[in-house]
Amino acid sequence: MSEQSSNIVSKVWGLCNPLRDDGVSYGDYLEQLTYLIFLKMSDEYSRPPYKRETGIPKGYTWSDMNTLKGAELENQYRAILERLGDEGGILGQIFKGAVNKISNVSILYRVVQMIDKENWVSMSSDVKGEIYEGLLQKNAEDVKSGAGQYFTPRPLIKAMVACLRPEPKKTIADPCCGSGGFFLAAQAFLANPKNYALDRTEKEFLKNETFYGTELVVATFKLCLMNLYLHNIGDLYGKVPVMRGDALLSDPGYRVDYVLTNPPFGKKSSITFTNEEEEQEEEDLVYNRQDFWTTSSNKQLNFIQHINTILKPTGKAAVVVPDNVLFEGGSGEIIRKKLLETTDLHTILRLPTGIFYKPGVKANVIFFDKRPASPERQTKEVWIYDFRTNVHFTLRQHPMTDADLQDFIQCYHPENRHERTETWSQENPEGRWRRFSVEEILERDKTSLDIFWLKDKSLADLDNLPEPDELAADIIENLQSALESFQELMNQLKKND
């Protein structure tokens, strides 16, 4: 992050501490910053040399508020939020249901003045984006806010984009887009002159037609819209690039070239989904997804099926999934077999611990290419990069960086992934990059993709065992997976009675 961006983040975030004493959470504060920065930017755009129509009604602009103090400021801010919530497009989506949560008027005044001092429009989109991303990260670092679940490590996002290598005038979806991190990384990749020299129509497509997102949580949805707008994605009056809602409820109808996503971690969905061939118990609340391969209450498994639906026949996906997706029985096994049959599930990246804000998370990235319908099995081999064994990061003292993922990207060989070379061999058993034939995988119990071969040195070192929370998380995950497998077996036995 640049020094300018870092200084602004520190100043703006410094005002949050006294607000905490008034019961204002980091998330609430960030939401208020979203509203205020948007108002200030809109005011700047309405003036020379831009003179842009902002859509904000007269009497409800930044300049109608920024000189006020005390109760007058509070009342005017409240009136602006209520009025703009009734507007259309991105404007209305950002301000819908907005209320002032900074009841301390002296701090509200200080925040307004701090934002007023900066010329946001004259900043490059990189600087604006850095500032907002910095604020999002501050929010994610707050354990109590729970916002870390929406925050995928940026080095991982960039590596996933680098491997997929999205092309101009192609569409990209994220069905649980959080604050929009995958979209911003894809935009940066596409706009980088080292990758492509975009012409005018390609730039316009990148801004208005490339991205399709869905986000369930209202506050996060608003943060995402603001984040995209600050990075020049979307338009005040054009198509809103992100919809609010549960992506799993139905087939959205669109088909895209790429999916980049990190579905929310968590074992169960509150709704059981069924495909066209499965029966349900009467008490279940059911959404009939005829496009799904099988029924599951596991959110990650449902997202994989949803991603398969929204991909074009030649589409490509990179998806972060927890370990249980790779080894769980029942629906998990059915979905793994379907992926191997109907897509080219060519790569798995085993992720290290300590990179997510939720402690003890063990995750992977699966890369698969959809294929047109064919009687032949589409996956011939699966390449696995073990970036977990004997690797550990922490969020503060030893965070994962872009450089840490360069070896994986080189092994992946994005320019032509069919020209790959294993680093593992009988002579080099410590190699992290290894190929497995699909026949080897199909012979494994439950078609498990949870494959590792490196010796875990921490298990041999009793003084360097994993942290207790990691061990506890492992035990809980294994017990939950076993319980779900037994539950599915019991349900199947009931149906057969």
Annotate each predicted stretch with a short phrase.
Residues 1-168, 232, 236-247, 350-353, ...:
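Non-catalytic, mostly N-terminal accessory regions of nucleic-acid modification and defense proteins
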Residues 256-257, 361-367, 398-403:
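Short, surface-exposed amphipathic charged segments that create phosphate/polyanion-binding patches used
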Residues 146-261, 265-279, 289-291, 301, ...:
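Conserved S-adenosyl-L-methionine
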Residues 207, 255, 259, 361-362, ...:
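A generic structural signal for well-ordered coil/turn residues at beta-strand boundaries
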Residues 3, 270-298, 323-331, 352-358, ...:
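Short, contiguous acidic/charged loop-to-helix segments that flank catalytic cores in large enzymes
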Residues 121, 213-219, 258, 293-297, ...:
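Hydrophobic alpha-helical scaffolding
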Residues 29, 216-221, 293-368:
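Conserved Class I SAM-dependent methyltransferase catalytic core
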